[in-house]
Design a protein with these regions (language model features):
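Generic beta-strand/beta-sheet core signal
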Residues: 21, 28-30, 56-57, 82-83, ...
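Walker A/P-loop NTP-binding active-site region of P-loop NTPases
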Residues: 30-69, 116, 125-126
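Generic, well-ordered alpha-helical scaffold segments in large soluble proteins
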Residues: 33, 41-49, 84, 88-91, ...
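Loop/turn-to-beta-strand initiation segments
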Residues: 50-52, 76-79, 105-114
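Conserved P-loop NTPase "ATPase switch" module shared by AAA+ and STAND
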Residues: 60, 72-95, 111
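Short acidic, S/G/P-rich loop/turn micro-motifs used as interaction or catalytic elements
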Residues: 32-34, 60-63, 85-93, 119-121, ...
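Conserved P-loop NTPase motor module
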Residues: 1-29, 33-48, 129-131, 156-184
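Conserved ATP-driven motor cores of ASCE-family P-loop NTPases powering translocation/secretion/packaging/pilus
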Residues: 38, 100-182
Length: 184
Protein backbone atom coordinates (compact mmCIF):
# COMPACT_ATOMS: atom_id res chain seq x y z
CA UNK A 1 0.00 0.00 0.00
CA UNK A 2 1.34 3.37 -1.04
CA UNK A 3 0.18 6.61 0.64
CA UNK A 4 -0.45 9.30 -1.95
CA UNK A 5 -3.12 11.76 -0.77
CA UNK A 6 -5.50 12.97 1.89
CA UNK A 7 -8.97 11.52 1.43
CA UNK A 8 -12.28 13.06 2.53
CA UNK A 9 -15.18 10.62 2.80
CA UNK A 10 -17.55 13.28 4.11
CA UNK A 11 -16.99 12.31 7.74
CA UNK A 12 -13.26 11.80 8.21
CA UNK A 13 -10.09 13.03 6.57
CA UNK A 14 -7.57 10.20 6.29
CA UNK A 15 -4.62 9.02 4.24
CA UNK A 16 -5.50 7.50 0.86
CA UNK A 17 -3.47 4.50 -0.29
CA UNK A 18 -2.85 3.03 -3.73
CA UNK A 19 -2.62 -0.76 -3.78
CA UNK A 20 0.19 -1.17 -6.30
CA UNK A 21 0.21 -4.94 -5.85
CA UNK A 22 -3.21 -5.57 -7.39
CA UNK A 23 -3.91 -4.24 -10.86
CA UNK A 24 -3.14 -1.26 -13.03
CA UNK A 25 -3.90 2.34 -12.10
CA UNK A 26 -5.07 5.12 -14.41
CA UNK A 27 -4.32 8.77 -13.62
CA UNK A 28 -6.54 11.02 -15.72
CA UNK A 29 -6.59 14.80 -16.00
CA UNK A 30 -5.76 17.89 -17.99
CA UNK A 31 -2.29 19.36 -18.36
CA UNK A 32 -1.31 21.00 -15.06
CA UNK A 33 -3.80 19.03 -12.96
CA UNK A 34 -1.15 17.13 -11.00
CA UNK A 35 -0.70 13.87 -12.95
CA UNK A 36 3.09 14.04 -13.31
CA UNK A 37 3.43 15.20 -9.70
CA UNK A 38 1.48 12.14 -8.54
CA UNK A 39 3.60 9.76 -10.65
CA UNK A 40 6.85 11.28 -9.37
CA UNK A 41 5.67 11.23 -5.76
CA UNK A 42 4.68 7.56 -5.97
CA UNK A 43 7.79 6.54 -7.91
CA UNK A 44 10.12 8.21 -5.40
CA UNK A 45 8.40 6.52 -2.43
CA UNK A 46 8.56 3.11 -4.07
CA UNK A 47 12.16 3.69 -5.12
CA UNK A 48 13.13 4.53 -1.54
CA UNK A 49 11.34 1.45 -0.21
CA UNK A 50 13.20 -0.97 -2.52
CA UNK A 51 10.12 -3.23 -2.55
CA UNK A 52 9.82 -3.64 -6.31
CA UNK A 53 11.36 -2.99 -9.70
CA UNK A 54 10.64 0.56 -10.89
CA UNK A 55 10.39 1.76 -14.52
CA UNK A 56 9.51 5.30 -15.57
CA UNK A 57 8.64 6.21 -19.16
CA UNK A 58 8.08 9.73 -20.46
CA UNK A 59 8.37 11.64 -23.68
CA UNK A 60 11.41 13.89 -23.96
CA UNK A 61 11.61 16.10 -27.02
CA UNK A 62 10.21 13.82 -29.73
CA UNK A 63 11.19 10.40 -28.38
CA UNK A 64 10.13 8.12 -25.55
CA UNK A 65 12.62 7.52 -22.75
CA UNK A 66 12.43 4.72 -20.20
CA UNK A 67 14.49 4.76 -17.02
CA UNK A 68 14.83 1.54 -15.08
CA UNK A 69 15.47 3.29 -11.79
CA UNK A 70 15.85 0.28 -9.58
CA UNK A 71 15.60 -3.41 -10.24
CA UNK A 72 14.78 -5.67 -7.34
CA UNK A 73 15.56 -9.32 -8.13
CA UNK A 74 14.00 -10.58 -4.88
CA UNK A 75 10.62 -9.07 -5.83
CA UNK A 76 8.68 -10.32 -8.82
CA UNK A 77 6.50 -7.23 -9.26
CA UNK A 78 7.44 -4.42 -11.61
CA UNK A 79 5.78 -1.02 -11.23
CA UNK A 80 5.86 0.83 -14.54
CA UNK A 81 5.03 4.54 -14.49
CA UNK A 82 4.10 5.98 -17.89
CA UNK A 83 3.63 9.75 -18.10
CA UNK A 84 1.53 11.31 -20.88
CA UNK A 85 0.59 7.87 -22.22
CA UNK A 86 -2.19 9.08 -24.57
CA UNK A 87 -0.05 8.66 -27.69
CA UNK A 88 1.14 5.18 -26.68
CA UNK A 89 -2.41 4.00 -26.00
CA UNK A 90 -3.76 5.17 -29.35
CA UNK A 91 -5.02 2.25 -31.46
CA UNK A 92 -2.92 3.67 -34.31
CA UNK A 93 0.36 3.83 -32.35
CA UNK A 94 3.06 1.99 -34.30
CA UNK A 95 6.04 2.45 -32.00
CA UNK A 96 7.64 -0.38 -29.97
CA UNK A 97 6.86 1.38 -26.67
CA UNK A 98 3.13 1.21 -27.47
CA UNK A 99 3.28 -2.56 -27.96
CA UNK A 100 5.27 -2.99 -24.74
CA UNK A 101 2.73 -0.91 -22.82
CA UNK A 102 -0.25 -2.87 -24.16
CA UNK A 103 1.50 -6.14 -23.23
CA UNK A 104 2.33 -4.85 -19.74
CA UNK A 105 -1.28 -3.80 -19.13
CA UNK A 106 -2.28 -7.46 -19.56
CA UNK A 107 0.61 -8.88 -17.50
CA UNK A 108 -0.40 -9.70 -13.90
CA UNK A 109 3.21 -9.38 -12.66
CA UNK A 110 3.37 -5.73 -13.79
CA UNK A 111 1.45 -2.82 -12.33
CA UNK A 112 1.15 -0.03 -14.87
CA UNK A 113 0.43 3.42 -13.49
CA UNK A 114 -0.35 5.48 -16.58
CA UNK A 115 -1.18 9.17 -16.79
CA UNK A 116 -3.42 10.37 -19.62
CA UNK A 117 -5.28 13.55 -20.49
CA UNK A 118 -8.37 11.85 -21.89
CA UNK A 119 -10.07 8.66 -20.73
CA UNK A 120 -9.33 5.86 -23.20
CA UNK A 121 -11.06 2.50 -23.32
CA UNK A 122 -7.73 0.68 -23.79
CA UNK A 123 -6.65 1.94 -20.37
CA UNK A 124 -9.95 2.12 -18.51
CA UNK A 125 -10.90 -1.51 -19.14
CA UNK A 126 -7.56 -2.58 -17.58
CA UNK A 127 -7.67 -0.17 -14.60
CA UNK A 128 -10.20 -0.70 -11.83
CA UNK A 129 -8.33 1.88 -9.76
CA UNK A 130 -8.19 5.48 -10.97
CA UNK A 131 -7.19 8.89 -9.76
CA UNK A 132 -9.14 11.39 -11.83
CA UNK A 133 -8.63 15.14 -11.78
CA UNK A 134 -11.94 16.73 -12.80
CA UNK A 135 -11.89 19.62 -15.25
CA UNK A 136 -15.32 21.10 -14.53
CA UNK A 137 -16.87 19.83 -17.76
CA UNK A 138 -19.45 17.45 -16.27
CA UNK A 139 -19.73 15.05 -19.24
CA UNK A 140 -15.95 14.62 -19.41
CA UNK A 141 -15.68 14.18 -15.64
CA UNK A 142 -18.39 11.50 -15.62
CA UNK A 143 -16.62 9.71 -18.53
CA UNK A 144 -13.55 9.48 -16.28
CA UNK A 145 -15.69 7.49 -13.86
CA UNK A 146 -16.37 10.23 -11.32
CA UNK A 147 -19.87 9.81 -9.86
CA UNK A 148 -22.18 12.83 -10.16
CA UNK A 149 -22.69 12.89 -6.39
CA UNK A 150 -18.95 13.40 -5.85
CA UNK A 151 -18.80 16.12 -8.52
CA UNK A 152 -21.62 17.94 -6.74
CA UNK A 153 -19.25 18.44 -3.79
CA UNK A 154 -16.64 20.24 -5.90
CA UNK A 155 -16.66 24.03 -5.77
CA UNK A 156 -15.49 26.32 -8.56
CA UNK A 157 -12.13 26.86 -6.85
CA UNK A 158 -11.48 23.12 -6.49
CA UNK A 159 -10.95 22.70 -10.23
CA UNK A 160 -8.03 25.15 -10.17
CA UNK A 161 -6.09 23.42 -7.38
CA UNK A 162 -3.38 21.08 -8.70
CA UNK A 163 -3.69 17.64 -7.15
CA UNK A 164 -7.38 18.00 -6.25
CA UNK A 165 -9.00 14.86 -7.59
CA UNK A 166 -11.15 11.83 -7.01
CA UNK A 167 -9.84 8.42 -5.96
CA UNK A 168 -11.92 5.72 -7.61
CA UNK A 169 -11.46 2.13 -6.54
CA UNK A 170 -13.96 -0.33 -7.98
CA UNK A 171 -17.36 1.01 -6.82
CA UNK A 172 -16.03 3.52 -4.28
CA UNK A 173 -15.10 7.14 -5.00
CA UNK A 174 -13.98 9.95 -2.71
CA UNK A 175 -12.34 13.36 -3.11
CA UNK A 176 -8.58 13.55 -2.48
CA UNK A 177 -5.81 16.11 -2.33
CA UNK A 178 -2.61 14.52 -3.63
CA UNK A 179 0.72 15.02 -1.90
CA UNK A 180 3.18 17.40 -3.50
CA UNK A 181 6.39 15.90 -4.89
CA UNK A 182 9.40 17.35 -3.07
CA UNK A 183 12.17 15.97 -5.30
CA UNK A 184 14.60 13.09 -5.04
Amino acid sequence: MLPFALSDDGVLISTAFLDVGHGNIAVIGACGSGKTNLLLCCASRLYESGRCTIRFTRKTNSEWTTDDGRTSPQHERTIWFVDDADELLSPFAAMPEADKLKTALADPSVTVIAAVEKPQSTLLERCLTRVAFPCGERATDVMMGIPSAVLDGFGVDDYAIAGRGVFIQQARACPVQCAEFQGF
